């Protein structure tokens, strides 16, 4: 199969995709490669830059670099136009090379959800990290302050009075003044209630080894709300108490230079929030089936603001049984999130990754071709964050050829 044939069939899914709750509709089929068409090569050869992504051993996690770069450029342009900045979450890609790319293209910092993730990122040369999860244990606080001692632009979130005092003690022991932001709750997952935030801010302002920088308010519950107008109404309503808390702290003379939050689902909404400074976007980089299903400002059917750039290549293992086949991408390759993975080019197929090692595909209408053992398919992942965490490498491709291979720097860093 020629590169031209391969490229035209596989690139078509971006321009025409529309999502349902289970899969993405793509009018032009992806014909795939037969096993006999694969270039004989060792695994090491297949992993090198320059080979076709269809020659990679599977399951293989791939990102189309052109699409990813366009996603980043669109996010940066949109936020710049609305007067906001991006502070993207590393928990999406867990990859130092991508974090550095985001910083080089205009992001003001990188968010980390877990301390080990932050340690992996700084160890790989990523700076300007904001730790968005409070570290309640003394051991973790000491480690966070160790990062701050060597990286003056490190910011730690705090949401309890005793946590602030512990941070102050650890910062004093390390001989530093640590930058902190307050996690002001939106919902009931984490953070301090908005009404109580000013008192915590006043305490922090009095602690000699802490410097208050502002507040975070991330509303995770609204990011996947179906329909743009519904999402907009909910996002603006739920953050009203937080805006009031921000204004109370600002009026009392406290330093409130940061008002951060939001996400990929509300990237074009948060500019309407008074005093907001930056967005903690993540999935915009890759997209996934969950986000494709939420709808956009142009219509509730599909979230087409950003292109799906992250895919998993999988191989057919069994085709003996009617209207179904088995592949090598199970829950360890895709996770168990819903909606399930979308089979690119095959709108009649539904994918079930319920088995650890195997994926099951069923269909009620004929596929675009009769798939044989060794044929490969391309999948849009259900949820990009946990899917990335299943892999050691991401293959960066351009025009269906591997251009770069990135180590997933913070894979497994969940502590």
Q: Which functions belong to the PLM regions below?
A:
Residues 2-21:
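N-terminal secretory signal peptides and thylakoid transit peptides that target proteins
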Residues 68, 91, 121, 182, ...:
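Conserved, mostly hydrophobic/aromatic
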Residues 236-415:
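Active-site anion/phosphate-binding pocket segments in diverse small-molecule metabolic enzymes
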Residues 53-64, 128-131, 145-156, 226-236, ...:
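Glycine-rich tight-turn/loop motif centered on a GG-T
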Residues 89-224:
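Active-site-proximal beta-alpha core segment in soluble small-molecule metabolic enzymes
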Residues 5, 172-177, 185-296:
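Active-site loop/helix belt of alpha/beta enzymes
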Residues 55, 60-64, 69-81, 93-105, ...:
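N-terminal capping/small domains of soluble enzymes
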Residues 25-74, 78:
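C-terminal segment of N-terminal export signals and the immediately downstream linker at the start
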């Amino acid at each position: 199969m020629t590169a031209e044939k391969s490229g035209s069939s596989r690139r078509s899914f971006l321009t025409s995709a529309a999502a349902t709750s289970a899969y993405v509709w793509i009018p032009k089929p992806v014909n795939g490669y037969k096993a006999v068409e694969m270039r004989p090569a060792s695994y090491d050869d297949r992993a090198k830059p320059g080979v076709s992504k269809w020659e990679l051993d599977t399951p293989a996690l791939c990102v189309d670099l052109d699409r990813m770069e366009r996603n980043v450029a669109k996010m940066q342009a949109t936020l710049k136009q609305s007067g906001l900045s991006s502070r993207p979450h590393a928990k999406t890609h867990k990859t130092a090379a991508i974090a550095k790319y985001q910083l080089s293209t205009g992001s003001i910092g990188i968010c980390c959800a877990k301390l080990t993730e932050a340690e992996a990122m700084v160890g790989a040369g990523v700076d300007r990290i904001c730790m968005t999860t409070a570290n309640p244990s003394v051991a973790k606080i000491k480690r966070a302050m160790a990062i701050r001692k060597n990286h003056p632009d490190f910011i730690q979130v705090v949401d309890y009075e005793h946590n602030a005092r512990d941070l102050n003690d650890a910062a004093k022991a390390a001989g530093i003044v640590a930058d902190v932001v307050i996690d002001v709750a939106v919902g009931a997952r984490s953070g301090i209630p908005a009404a109580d935030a000013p008192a915590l801010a006043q305490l922090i302002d009095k602690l000699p080894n802490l410097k208050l920088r502002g507040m975070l308010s991330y509303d995770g519950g609204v990011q996947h709300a179906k329909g743009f107008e519904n999402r907009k109404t909910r996002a603006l309503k739920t953050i009203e108490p937080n805006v009031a808390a921000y204004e109370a702290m600002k009026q009392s003379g406290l330093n409130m230079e940061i008002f951060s939050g939001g996400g990929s689902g509300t990237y074009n909404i948060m500019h309407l929030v008074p005093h907001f400074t930056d967005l903690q976007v993540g999935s915009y980089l890759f997209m996934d089936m969950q986000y494709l299903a939420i709808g956009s400002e142009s219509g509730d059917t599909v979230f087409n603001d950003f292109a799906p750039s992250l895919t998993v290549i999988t191989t057919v293992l069994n085709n003996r049984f009617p209207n179904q086949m088995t592949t090598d991408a199970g829950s360890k390759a895709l996770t168990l999130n819903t909606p399930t993975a979308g089979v690119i080019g095959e709108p009649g197929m539904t994918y079930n990754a319920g088995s650890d090692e195997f994926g099951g595909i069923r269909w009620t209408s004929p596929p675009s071709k009769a798939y044989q053992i060794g044929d490969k398919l391309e999948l849009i992942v259900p949820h990009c964050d946990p899917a990335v965490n299943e892999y050691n490498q991401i293959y960066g491709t351009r025009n269906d050829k591997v251009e770069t291979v990135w180590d997933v720097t913070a894979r497994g860093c969940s502590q």
